[in-house]
């Protein structure tokens, strides 16, 4: 197992790919806005798409969100708030994911889900305490490999990965917001920065 602190340049990309080609498990970090964005970034740094597709197993993207403190305020989304959310994510996908997670019943809509807001206290003036990750896990399947070889855009790779079941960071954040771990506002703040 080889850990590369961060891949920033062509030389580091080349070393990581060569190590992976010789059978080493290589773990590294890379600065991108999404899991799918890592692939064009590697290509921009000089990695050949056929080498990326044969050496990459999975990409995990993460952002840290603040955790709600124990004192929090319960609320439900208005129709207007749901309409505003559609500019950040697919409301239908979020609804389906919440149903799969048993956070929403079959006949219910997103407006029926209880979400939580921060509540200021003496101990936690902003209503938050600690942090946790929201994640996007992109497995490199055969169809994703062929998109890599075709030099497809991050958007095309993301779209295909979502069709194959990948949950985006926003969607993962919504699950955690519905569980009362963080707030929708915090999720949107972090993913739109």
Say what each PLM segment does.
Residues 1-193:
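Short, flexible helix-loop junctions that flank or precede catalytic/ligand sites
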């Amino acid at each position: 197992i080889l850990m590369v602190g961060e891949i920033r340049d062509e030389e580091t990309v080349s070393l990581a790919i060569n190590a992976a080609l010789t059978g080493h498990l290589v773990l590294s970090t890379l600065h991108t806005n999404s899991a799918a964005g890592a692939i064009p970034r590697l290509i921009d740094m000089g990695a050949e798409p056929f080498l990326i597709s044969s050496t990459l197993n999975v990409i995990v993207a993460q952002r840290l969100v603040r955790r709600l403190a124990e004192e929090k305020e319960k609320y439900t989304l208005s129709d207007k708030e749901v309409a505003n959310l559609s500019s950040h994510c697919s409301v239908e996908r979020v609804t389906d994911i919440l149903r799969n997670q048993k956070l929403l019943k079959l006949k219910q809509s997103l407006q029926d889900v209880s979400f939580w807001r921060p509540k200021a206290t003496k101990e936690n003036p902003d209503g938050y305490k600690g942090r946790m990750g929201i994640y996007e896990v992109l497995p490199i399947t055969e169809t994703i490999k062929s998109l890599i070889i075709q030099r497809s855009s991050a958007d095309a790779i993301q779209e295909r990965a979502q069709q194959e079941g990948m949950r985006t960071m926003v969607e993962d954040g919504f699950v955690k917001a519905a569980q009362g771990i963080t707030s929708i506002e915090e999720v949107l703040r972090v993913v739109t920065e």
